[in-house]
Protein backbone atom coordinates (compact mmCIF):
# COMPACT_ATOMS: atom_id res chain seq x y z
CA UNK A 1 0.00 0.00 0.00
CA UNK A 2 1.18 3.52 -0.81
CA UNK A 3 1.96 5.84 2.09
CA UNK A 4 -0.51 8.71 2.24
CA UNK A 5 -0.26 12.13 3.86
CA UNK A 6 -3.36 14.06 4.84
CA UNK A 7 -3.34 17.75 3.88
CA UNK A 8 -5.74 20.66 4.17
CA UNK A 9 -6.24 23.37 1.54
CA UNK A 10 -8.37 26.49 1.24
CA UNK A 11 -10.18 27.13 -2.04
CA UNK A 12 -12.64 29.76 -3.25
CA UNK A 13 -16.17 28.34 -3.10
CA UNK A 14 -16.80 28.74 -6.84
CA UNK A 15 -13.52 26.98 -7.74
CA UNK A 16 -14.37 24.02 -5.52
CA UNK A 17 -17.92 23.85 -6.93
CA UNK A 18 -16.58 23.73 -10.49
CA UNK A 19 -14.02 21.09 -9.50
CA UNK A 20 -16.75 19.01 -7.83
CA UNK A 21 -18.82 19.19 -11.04
CA UNK A 22 -15.86 17.80 -12.99
CA UNK A 23 -15.34 15.08 -10.38
CA UNK A 24 -18.95 13.97 -10.83
CA UNK A 25 -18.78 14.23 -14.62
CA UNK A 26 -15.62 12.12 -14.83
CA UNK A 27 -16.82 9.60 -12.25
CA UNK A 28 -14.02 9.90 -9.71
CA UNK A 29 -14.50 7.76 -6.61
CA UNK A 30 -13.51 10.66 -4.37
CA UNK A 31 -12.36 14.26 -4.32
CA UNK A 32 -8.96 13.03 -3.07
CA UNK A 33 -8.47 10.87 -6.16
CA UNK A 34 -9.31 13.81 -8.43
CA UNK A 35 -6.85 16.03 -6.58
CA UNK A 36 -4.13 13.35 -6.85
CA UNK A 37 -4.82 13.11 -10.59
CA UNK A 38 -4.62 16.91 -10.93
CA UNK A 39 -1.32 17.01 -9.05
CA UNK A 40 0.08 14.27 -11.32
CA UNK A 41 -0.90 16.32 -14.40
CA UNK A 42 0.75 19.39 -12.88
CA UNK A 43 3.96 17.45 -12.16
CA UNK A 44 4.08 16.11 -15.73
CA UNK A 45 3.60 19.64 -17.15
CA UNK A 46 6.30 21.01 -14.85
CA UNK A 47 8.78 18.28 -15.84
CA UNK A 48 8.06 18.83 -19.55
CA UNK A 49 8.60 22.59 -19.32
CA UNK A 50 11.79 22.20 -17.31
CA UNK A 51 13.23 19.59 -19.68
CA UNK A 52 13.25 22.01 -22.63
CA UNK A 53 16.68 22.92 -23.98
CA UNK A 54 18.18 24.98 -26.76
CA UNK A 55 16.72 27.72 -28.90
CA UNK A 56 12.93 28.01 -28.84
CA UNK A 57 10.19 30.33 -30.03
CA UNK A 58 6.72 30.48 -28.58
CA UNK A 59 4.05 32.23 -26.59
CA UNK A 60 3.33 32.78 -22.94
CA UNK A 61 -0.38 33.44 -22.41
CA UNK A 62 -1.32 35.08 -19.11
CA UNK A 63 -4.76 35.75 -17.61
CA UNK A 64 -4.82 38.00 -14.58
CA UNK A 65 -7.14 40.05 -12.38
CA UNK A 66 -6.15 43.63 -13.13
CA UNK A 67 -7.67 44.78 -9.80
CA UNK A 68 -5.11 42.72 -7.88
CA UNK A 69 -2.61 44.99 -6.15
CA UNK A 70 0.24 46.03 -8.46
CA UNK A 71 -0.13 42.97 -10.72
CA UNK A 72 0.08 44.98 -13.96
CA UNK A 73 3.13 46.88 -12.74
CA UNK A 74 4.85 43.66 -11.60
CA UNK A 75 4.15 41.89 -14.91
CA UNK A 76 5.50 44.87 -16.85
CA UNK A 77 8.64 45.06 -14.71
CA UNK A 78 9.30 41.33 -15.17
CA UNK A 79 8.80 41.63 -18.93
CA UNK A 80 11.27 44.53 -19.11
CA UNK A 81 13.82 42.34 -17.33
CA UNK A 82 13.50 39.84 -20.21
CA UNK A 83 13.47 42.29 -23.13
CA UNK A 84 16.15 40.28 -24.96
CA UNK A 85 13.80 37.31 -25.46
CA UNK A 86 10.45 39.12 -25.75
CA UNK A 87 9.58 39.89 -29.36
CA UNK A 88 6.12 41.41 -28.82
CA UNK A 89 3.12 41.46 -26.50
CA UNK A 90 -0.62 41.61 -27.12
CA UNK A 91 -3.01 42.86 -24.44
CA UNK A 92 -6.73 42.05 -24.41
CA UNK A 93 -9.53 42.96 -22.00
CA UNK A 94 -11.55 39.80 -21.25
CA UNK A 95 -14.15 41.34 -18.94
CA UNK A 96 -14.43 44.08 -16.32
CA UNK A 97 -11.95 42.32 -14.00
CA UNK A 98 -9.65 40.23 -16.18
CA UNK A 99 -7.07 40.83 -18.87
CA UNK A 100 -5.08 38.50 -21.07
CA UNK A 101 -1.58 39.10 -22.35
CA UNK A 102 0.14 37.02 -24.97
CA UNK A 103 3.91 37.40 -24.90
CA UNK A 104 5.82 36.26 -27.98
CA UNK A 105 9.24 34.95 -27.03
CA UNK A 106 12.33 33.73 -28.85
CA UNK A 107 15.57 32.63 -27.24
CA UNK A 108 17.18 30.04 -25.02
CA UNK A 109 14.69 27.67 -23.38
CA UNK A 110 16.18 28.27 -19.94
CA UNK A 111 15.40 32.00 -20.18
CA UNK A 112 11.88 31.30 -21.44
CA UNK A 113 11.27 28.88 -18.54
CA UNK A 114 12.61 31.41 -16.04
CA UNK A 115 10.34 34.14 -17.41
CA UNK A 116 7.33 31.81 -17.35
CA UNK A 117 8.00 30.84 -13.73
CA UNK A 118 8.30 34.48 -12.63
CA UNK A 119 5.05 35.45 -14.37
CA UNK A 120 3.22 32.42 -12.95
CA UNK A 121 4.19 33.18 -9.35
CA UNK A 122 2.69 36.68 -9.25
CA UNK A 123 -0.33 37.31 -7.03
CA UNK A 124 -3.37 38.07 -9.18
CA UNK A 125 -2.22 35.86 -12.06
CA UNK A 126 -4.96 33.28 -12.65
CA UNK A 127 -3.47 31.18 -15.43
CA UNK A 128 -0.27 30.94 -17.49
CA UNK A 129 0.24 28.69 -20.50
CA UNK A 130 3.55 28.24 -22.27
CA UNK A 131 3.60 26.99 -25.84
CA UNK A 132 7.00 26.47 -27.48
CA UNK A 133 8.28 25.38 -30.86
CA UNK A 134 11.68 24.77 -32.38
CA UNK A 135 12.51 27.80 -34.56
CA UNK A 136 14.21 27.66 -37.92
CA UNK A 137 12.13 24.94 -39.50
CA UNK A 138 13.92 22.11 -37.67
CA UNK A 139 10.74 20.05 -37.74
CA UNK A 140 11.01 16.34 -38.55
CA UNK A 141 9.49 15.37 -41.89
From Swiss-Prot:
It holds the Pfam family RHH_1. InterPro entries: Acetolactate_synth/TF_NikR_C, ACT-like_dom_sf, Arc_rbn_hlx_hlx, CopG, CopG/NikR_regulator, Ni_resp_reg_NikR, Ribbon_hlx_hlx, TF_NikR_Ni-bd_C. Signal peptide: none annotated. Keywords: DNA-binding, Metal-binding, Nickel, Transcription, Transcription regulation. The keyword Transcription regulation applies. The keyword Transcription applies. Binds 1 nickel ion per subunit. Ni(2+) binds at residues 80, 91, 93, 99. SUPFAM superfamilies: ACT-like, Ribbon-helix-helix. Its cofactor is Ni(2+). It comes from the Archaea. GO terms for molecular function: DNA binding; DNA-binding transcription factor activity; nickel cation binding. GO terms for biological process: response to nickel cation. Transcriptional regulator. Belongs to the transcriptional regulatory CopG/NikR family. This is Putative nickel-responsive regulator.
Amino acid sequence: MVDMDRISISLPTNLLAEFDDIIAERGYASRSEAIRDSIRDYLIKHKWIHSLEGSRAGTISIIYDHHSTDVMEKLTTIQHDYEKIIVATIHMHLDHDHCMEVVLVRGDASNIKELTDKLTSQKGVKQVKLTVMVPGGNIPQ
